[in-house]
Amino acid sequence: MRRLLIVLTLVLSACAGGPSDQQALCGPSGRLRVGLVGSEEGQRGSAGVILAEQEQFKLRELLMASSRCDVLLEPVLSPEQARLRLRNSEWDLAFLPPGLTAVALEQEGQFSLVRQLGRRQNSRSQLIVRADSRFKTRADLRGTRLGLLPRGSLTGFYLPLFNLHGLTLSQVGYELTYQDLMQGLQNGEFDAIAWDGALPTQGNEIRVIHEDTHAIPLGALALSQPLLAQDYKPFVQKLDDNVSQLPSSLGYATGVIPDLLMLQELRAIVSKVEGWSLPQAGQPYVVYGAPSPSMPGEGPL
């Protein structure tokens, strides 16, 4: 009943002002297709727990009331699947973590960022090994088995590869979460894995052999060009006004535009790595490509 009252209040307030008020904000399909990846990378166990079912229902209700359009909510755990949907313009708006935010900016102006998502956690992209490993530096990882998050992750894919340029790896494997990568490292499936420095580790059981210097930006709510070509600001304002009804795990920041300056450098790295030949699961891989000498950060060995 409480959720119904919230939706009715939003709809009635939207209708009360007359014909000059907000029009329906819909995508080209006549609906609003919403990508839900969340604000964090590699920390969910299945697509169903990006948000609990009740939270998804509540989010959809708020988006419908705010847009006056039918909403199709599409939770996606895999950053690779989300990257493909962004590239194919399958979403009208999306709640994205940092890596996919950078990917969205690469889509030839198809998306713009309108609100910041997430909470500052001092994330850093790391490469870690078991404490008893003989590997001490990045260069020691030649011929090893590396565990990554899927393509689309900033801390778990793009930055680790950028920092391993020039190495030949015996095998690259993928997991959907950092927890699964850690399990693979402990079980001997991987010799080294990508890791987010903001996450707790297994104490003395692991060792960091490299940490990237780039600060990791937060995620973003991205809107597609067809929405941006319409009067989208009342929709965003309604989200701002009802932020308490949004799932807290999204970290929606009322009135806060994402930090584009911080994103630009990482966007360049994403673009650079996307131009390389990329690793196939279970196959040997030569980290291929030539990062620009003028690009700040760690880069080649």
Predicted region positions:
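C-terminal motif of bacterial Sec signal peptides marking the signal peptidase cleavage site
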Residues: L12-A14
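Periplasmic-binding protein-like
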Residues: G27-G42, L117-V129, G203-W276, Q280-Q283, ...
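Bilobed "Venus flytrap"/periplasmic-binding protein-like clamshell domains
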Residues: R31-A65, N122-Q183, N187, L263-Q264
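A local structural motif
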Residues: M64-P75, L164-L176, I206, Q280-G289, ...
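Short helix-initiation/N-cap motifs at beta->coil->alpha
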Residues: L73-L84, Q171-Q183, A215-I216
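Acidic, polar ligand-binding/catalytic clefts
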Residues: V76-L77, Q81-D140
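A ligand-binding cleft/hinge motif common to bilobed small-molecule-binding domains
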Residues: F95-E108, Q183-I216
